[in-house]
Amino acid sequence: MSETSEQDARNLAAQHRELQQNAESVNQQLGMVQMSIEDCTRAILTLEELKSASGAINTMIPLGAGALIHANIADVDKIVVSVGAGISVEKTPTEAIETLTQRKEELGKVVERLNGTLTQIGQRLASIESAVGNRPPQ
């Protein structure tokens, strides 16, 4: 194999490794975004249930590390919703559901963009693999 061909092969191998790492990173981001979508979905469903409940609601609230506490929710007229940058605002249940639905839609768009990025990376990987596979032996 000539020195130029060896250098080309090393460059292609390096590009391939970098693209694989990029794909792993995008997959991790995709997983986190999908978890956020699931969180929004759970919150929306919970708020819809709370809206339809009457009187005090007995529930268990997670404290973390598998610990729960019994609690009574007496008032569901105001929901505190994070709006970003460490800021939270009070909203009605309907407004909170609207906010979470919008957030979920925005996250869905992020998923689409990340999937597009993964597709592009996959195409570039396939192109490199094809180029390496089509090289005549030296």
UniProtKB/Swiss-Prot annotation:
Lineage: Archaea, Methanobacteriati, Methanobacteriota, Stenosarchaea group, Methanomicrobia
One Gene Ontology term of the molecular function aspect: unfolded protein binding
The organism's place on the tree of life at top rank: Archaea
GO cellular component: cytoplasm; prefoldin complex
Subunit-structure text: Heterohexamer of two alpha and four beta subunits.
Subcellular location: Cytoplasm
Role: Molecular chaperone capable of stabilizing a range of proteins. Seems to fulfill an ATP-independent, HSP70-like function in archaeal de novo protein folding.
Protein name stated in the entry: Prefoldin subunit alpha
Major localisation: cytoplasm
GO biological process, one term: protein folding
Protein keywords: Chaperone, Cytoplasm
Family: Belongs to the prefoldin subunit alpha family.
CDD domains: Prefoldin_alpha_GimC (cd23160)
SUPFAM superfamilies: Prefoldin
Organism: Methanococcoides burtonii (strain DSM 6242 / NBRC 107633 / OCM 468 / ACE-M)
HAMAP family assigned to the protein according to its UniProt record, in alphabetical order: PfdA
One protein family per Pfam: Prefoldin
UniProt-listed InterPro entries: PFD_alpha_archaea, Prefoldin, Prefoldin_subunit_alpha
